[in-house]
């Protein structure tokens, strides 16, 4: 005698195929968003920026930083930022190169409830005079990763990584200095 085979049964038989497809697409979009956030967190990227932006006349600028507070590894880091900036903007006159934080921003990366790695980041800002027209404010990031029990490693292209530069007209520069 042959045993009957069970066919695939939809759990939600009261929904039409169109509704089931929409549910599937919604779940897929949620999964993709979570994966994107996880990858962004791992790389130190987020949609909101770093929270150091100021809006003037509808334009978002990074804040101007002129005080170096980071002394751990800063000499070499500042030199690397200065060198890269000078290559990118040879006509600009560098005013300051600073890391405006006291230590590395360090976070633990988790998979569920298990810590899988650590990451740390420091931001470097280069401010330069752009002729008589205004200023250039550039941000670089230094990032490192470490698995538990291992040494810090630097992902390729992140020592330093050029993140962004703002061209700032003189009139906006004066307003940014006050913020």
Question: Would you name each region that the model predicts?
Answer:
Residues 9-179:
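Cystatin/cathelin-like cysteine-protease inhibitor module
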């Amino acid at each position: 005698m042959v045993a009957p085979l069970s066919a695939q049964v939809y759990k939600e038989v009261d929904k039409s195929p169109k509704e089931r497809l929409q549910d599937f697409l919604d779940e897929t979009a949620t999964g993709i968003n979570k994966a994107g956030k996880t990858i962004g967190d791992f790389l130190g990227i987020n949609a909101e920026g770093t929270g150091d932006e100021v809006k003037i006349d509808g334009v978002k600028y990074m804040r101007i930083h002129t005080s170096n507070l980071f002394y751990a590894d800063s000499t070499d880091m500042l030199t690397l930022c200065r060198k890269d900036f000078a290559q990118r903007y040879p006509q600009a006159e560098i005013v300051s190169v600073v890391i405006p934080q006291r230590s590395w921003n360090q976070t633990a990366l988790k998979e569920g409830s298990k810590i899988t790695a650590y990451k740390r980041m420091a931001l470097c800002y280069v401010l330069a005079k752009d002729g008589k027209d205004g200023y250039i404010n550039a941000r670089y990031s230094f990032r490192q990763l470490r698995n538990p029990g291992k040494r810090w490693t630097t992902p390729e292209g992140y020592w330093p990584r050029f993140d962004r530069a703002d061209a700032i007209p003189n009139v906006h520069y004066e307003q940014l200095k006050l913020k």
